Every structure is written in structure tokens, then in C-alpha cells.
């Protein structure tokens, strides 16, 4: 009999960098991890997770476990971001910028078995993930701005995260999956008659928002089931490999405003087009070996950040910065050790090279660093939890980002600070 499992998670993440945070081109799934196990292993084992977060990292793996699950997680991030003037001695700190903002996300996920829809006994499992910043208070937050001071490329607000997909077993040992990352594209039109004093009349405002759907495709191979399904001593038992492709995604906004000042200006247009929370097209590959008590895994992401060079040419907020990006490879390694039937320890590490080649970006002043991400977590399974009829799994994890020093030149065409984000 297959039993659904309810999971409750708590994640903690700490970041150390060299700038103040404001806008963000990252998302919670790529910066930290969706569920506590993803955070603990620095996403090294995320492609082989039986939790609902697989819908984003590797939807094919949903078919590996037919048990339904309902998951909830609380992700708290504390960023300590500092910058120091060039050639400033350590004992004389001038114009030191310290940003200690904290943030939190609520993440909900579920998966359910739909195998009864098929005539044969073939697994098909549906998964869903939802992430909202500050319990929904910043559900559709958007921030894209010029700045006279440094602003972090990846750290900052995390927009709404939404992903839906399914995994399907083709033959024993081979699964495929598809899912979608859903973002938002907003368009606004504004018109008004304005007076020199600032008063307006005959205002008109139209706002339209539509979802933008980006695909995720993946495949998973269990070599033991493929090569030697009936031999429990086969060398391939416990060996799995996976591959995933995720298309680029972002949140976008287009504003078309027009003002009329009678007897002075007949047409004053204002056109703004910008993107936020950009994630590049990504190819991922992973391998896992599952022993009696130990699970070892490694993965690598190839991220095509160079595509952002052309995207920013049409961004009216950032096009003057002439930002340059490069493609990067992110290696990860992680483990899970099962101490007994109910308690496990997880850990992982990754090295993330910065895709930002530019060390100077006029009026935008993006900064980013190479970093080492380290995670550690614990998992506890409660077979009989109070009034619940199903097992409950509790996960706690901690992640630390160690950012390497890097020099940037901050440039601006403004004479005085005004309206920085």
C-alpha cells in the first residue's frame, strides 16, 4: 500500500557579499533551493529528489516515487553585504556600505499519483510548487532601477515562484518529465493632461498582465532497473543519471505613458521596457549512487547567461550600462547519510562562477561575485504524528554563501544621489 507523506521544512540561508542589495536577477529556486533538502545539499541532489520540488529541477523524477506528498517550507535569508572604497586600509573604513536586510519565503508543494488514468501499470505523477515572498505581501513585486550605488545582481527580492508539471515512466528504469515555469508579463498604458503645477486631468490607465510559460524537459535513467532488474548484487544497482533542460525565464514590464500640457507641450511620451528575475537557459546533468546507508551525488549546470547581452539592449532601464555576461558551468556535490530508519544527515557544496564580466556599468552599477555555497541539513521521519494518519517528515537545513572579493568601478551621470533603489 502506498502512503502519502506530509513534509514540513525549515530552511536558513546566510549570504556574505560585497555590495548592497536591491534588484535581483535570481530566484529562490536557483539562489538557495526550494525545499530544505535542496538547501542542505546546495542543489547537488535536487535532480534526484522525491519531493515536489522535482517539478522544477527534474520533473522526470516525479515518476520514481508514486507516493503523494504535501510539503510546506519556510525559507529565511539573512544577507550581510558590504563594500569598501578602493585602496582603503582595513583600519580606516571610509564610505562603508552595509546592507543587513533579511527576507523570508513561504513555499508550498504537492504531488499526486495519476497512474490510474492509464490502462497499464505505468507511473505518472503530477507535481506543483508555489513560492511567495513575505507570505504573499510581495506576491508580484517587481524592481528594476538605475542606481548610483552598488546593487547586487542576484540577491534581493524574490518574485512569485510557480511551477507545474508531471513525470511519466516509459519502461522500467527510464522516466521522462515535462513542466513549466510560469512568470508574468505586464503592460501598462497611461495618458493624462497635466498642468505645470503638477495637477492632472482626463487621466486614463490600462494595465494588462498575462502569464509567460517557459518549458522544462528532463529524463532519468535507473541503470539497475535497465541492466539487471533481477540481480540484487549487480554493480549498477543504485546508479542513476539524469539530464534537464530549462528555457530562459523572466518577469517583464512595459509602460507606455503620454502626457499633454495645454499650450506648452502637445505630446510628452514616456516609454519604459524592462525585465527582472531573469534566469538563463540551462542544461543540467547529474549522477547519483545509492548505497545501503549513503547516497552520493554530483551535478553540473551549464547556464547560457550570454543571451542576456541582447536582452538588455532592449531594456530601457539598463541599456546604457553596456553590461556583458558570459556562460558559466556550476559544479555541485552532495550526500545523504541515513543514521537509522528515521534520521538522516545531508550536506553539499557548489562553486558558482559569476556570469557578470563587466566591472563597470554606467548608472546601473551591478556587482556580482564568484562564490562557494555550503549546506548542511537534518531530516526526521515521524511514523505516527499525533492526530495524523500519515507519516510526517521534518527537515531543517542551513546554507552559507562565501563570496570572493572582487573590484568594481561605480559610475553615474547624476550630480547628486536621488531616488536610488
What are the language-model segments listed below?
Residues 2-23:
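Gram-negative bacterial Sec-dependent N-terminal signal peptides
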Residues 20-122, 360, 367-370:
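N-terminal, post-signal peptide beta-strand-biased segments of exported outer-membrane/organellar beta-barrel
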Residues 24-39, 105-421:
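Outer-membrane beta-barrel porins/channels
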